[in-house]
Design a protein with these regions (language model features):
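Single conserved hydrophobic/aromatic residue that forms the stacking wall/gate
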Residues: 1-5, 9-10
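Hydrophobic alpha-helical interface/terminus motif in multipass membrane transporters
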Residues: 10-12, 42
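A conserved pocket-lining segment of Rossmann-fold NAD(P)-dependent short-chain dehydrogenase/reductase
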Residues: 18-30, 41-65, 69, 73-92, ...
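Mid/C-terminal beta-alpha module of Rossmann-like enzyme folds, strongest
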Residues: 77-149, 163, 176, 182-199
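Short helix/strand-capping connector loops at secondary-structure junctions
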Residues: 161-173
Length: 199
């Protein structure tokens, strides 16, 4: 299911009233090394003899999550959800230029412009979402804006959570945890390619 489709499914489930089946969603962006993501793209460019690396925008940022962390989030959601939550992990951000420097430090970077529909930064919790968001420690959970099965307090008590501050939002450009060039190299070797080398 798409993100929008998943959220509509949850909303419909909540509106239709109590039943045995429960739905929740996980939201975590791109997985490190997944098909079409920037890490294998840069590695392939470098290894095929590119003389430069294309960067859509020098200020672009993204959240960073490994496949293992994504699976852990899914398992957490399965084991802990009341139903209707959207679970979001607390994960570091990276700058696209730092990924390029981690993979091919000697290649120049050329800005080519953002593609249609592409975002400069990744936003996983908007200010509007935050009005229904609680902090679970390692994760956030956006609660249903309309919930017939459980009250807001039920979710807070079930997850032993606290409400996020007013005006909170969770975006890759304002994150407080950041990957460095060196940490990206370590994670590429650990999660993407054990034979990764700097060239």
């Amino acid at each position: 299911l798409s993100l929008v489709g998943s959220e509509m499914c949850i909303r419909d489930s909540n509106i239709s009233g109590p039943r045995d089946i429960k739905f929740s969603v996980v939201r975590y962006g791109n997985v490190m090394g997944s098909r079409g993501s920037v890490i294998p793209f840069f590695i392939n460019k470098r290894d095929s003899g590119a003389v430069e690396l294309p960067i859509t925008n020098m200020k672009m940022t993204r959240f960073n999550i490994s496949l293992e962390a994504g699976v852990a989030l899914v398992m957490f959601a399965i084991g802990h959800h009341l139903g209707g939550e959207i679970f979001i992990p607390k994960i570091p951000s990276y700058r696209i230029v730092d990924v390029a420097k981690a993979i091919a430090p000697n290649l120049p970077l050329v800005e080519v412009g953002i593609r249609p529909g592409e975002k400069l930064h990744e936003e996983m919790i908007t200010v509007t979402d935050a009005m229904n968001t609680i902090d679970l420690g390692p994760y956030y959970a956006i609660l249903p804006s309309v919930a017939f099965n459980h009250k807001y307090e039920d979710y807070v008590n079930h997850h032993n959570a606290v409400k996020v501050p007013e005006g909170f939002h969770y975006s890759s450009d304002t994150n407080t945890e950041w990957e460095t060039v060196e940490s990206m190299r370590e994670k590429i070797k650990k999660y993407v390619d054990p034979n990764f080398e700097i060239k």
